[in-house]
Amino acid sequence: MARWAQSLDPGLLEQAAQALRDRTQWNESGVRPSAQRREAENESENLLVNRRSMRSFLASPVPLDAHLEKILAIASQAPSVSNTQSWRVRTYCDPARQEELLALQDGHSGISPIPLLLLVTVDIRSFSGANERNQMWIDGGIFVQQLLLAIEATGWSSCPMNFSATNSQAARLRKIAGIPGYEEVVCFVAMGRADAHPPASSLRRGVEFLRGN
């Protein structure tokens, strides 16, 4: 165990220790240092800097007509391989229906009641050959990021929720949600109006952690 611990990246250990300190300092005392966010120099940067995963929503419903259509129209401008645009989005606002679906996701316990739940899938018929076997996840991930930014840009908040499930869980989700076999589930996205006093978020890693050389 000692040798294994010594092999870990010191930066990873420090990040874990910082997360524990954050939980004690911010979540229990309610202090949110403003210095943890980078200053934006223009409106575009402001959107990118201030988007956060929101886990606490107001109870107000999300209008499924004008707002959602606008969000999806913006999200659909995301790039994709050969411009295949293979994404699909399903929406759920009924709490009982949401609970049925999220019971298979098993990672939403820290999120307040969700005004609108989105389920993002990718049509794998758009890809062919072994060289494109992972392209669905790349295109799906790019689309989800564009979707999150579109939600933020239109005045709403969101939280992506992964679907790292077993084959049996995935099969049950397909059956419940009516997802055909040629679509792969990318993730869920919770959407709504942000609570004015959400739980404090953890620190972001510095740019030095991003550089690979």
What residue spans do the PLM features occupy?
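Acidic, surface-exposed loops and disordered segments
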Residues: M1-N213
